[in-house]
């Protein structure tokens, strides 16, 4: 029996100016075995240029994994190792854990901004 990891994926809503950016993250919760590939989806309802993936570990603040300034433009954050992102459309910014490890057990947040 493989070691199981818990990935807590939270819904994060950020406000930009006087309007809110609707963010949908899925799945909301994810349990997987070590070594498996996991993709967390992030979809925004506004056409914001910037999108972000963060993780929050027990006893720590938010840490940036990756961000995107526009479709097809992504860059590494503070803790990018073991993750891959893509952004072919303005609305979507999936985060993939290439081979899930215990150290990636965390709460994950996606956000967007103008």
UniProtKB/Swiss-Prot annotation:
Its main location: membrane. Gene3D superfamilies: Immunoglobulins. Coiled coil: none annotated. GO terms for cellular component: plasma membrane; T cell receptor complex. One of its GO terms (biological process) is adaptive immune response. SMART domains: IGv. Keywords: Adaptive immunity, Cell membrane, Disulfide bond, Immunity, Immunoglobulin domain, Membrane, Receptor, Signal, T cell receptor. Disulfide bonds join 42-110. It is found in: Cell membrane. Residues 22-114 form the Ig-like domain. Residues 1-21 form the signal peptide. PANTHER family: T CELL RECEPTOR BETA VARIABLE 10-1-RELATED, T-CELL RECEPTOR BETA CHAIN. Alpha-beta TR is a heterodimer composed of an alpha and beta chain; disulfide-linked. The alpha-beta TR is associated with the transmembrane signaling CD3 coreceptor proteins to form the TR-CD3 (TcR or TCR). The assembly of alpha-beta TR heterodimers with CD3 occurs in the endoplasmic reticulum where a single alpha-beta TR heterodimer associates with one CD3D-CD3E heterodimer, one CD3G-CD3E heterodimer and one CD247 homodimer forming a stable octameric structure. CD3D-CD3E and CD3G-CD3E heterodimers preferentially associate with TR alpha and TR beta chains, respectively. V region of the variable domain of T cell receptor (TR) beta chain that participates in the antigen recognition. Alpha-beta T cell receptors are antigen specific receptors which are essential to the immune response and are present on the cell surface of T lymphocytes. Recognize peptide-major histocompatibility (MH) (pMH) complexes that are displayed by antigen presenting cells (APC), a prerequisite for efficient T cell adaptive immunity against pathogens. This is T cell receptor beta variable 10-2.
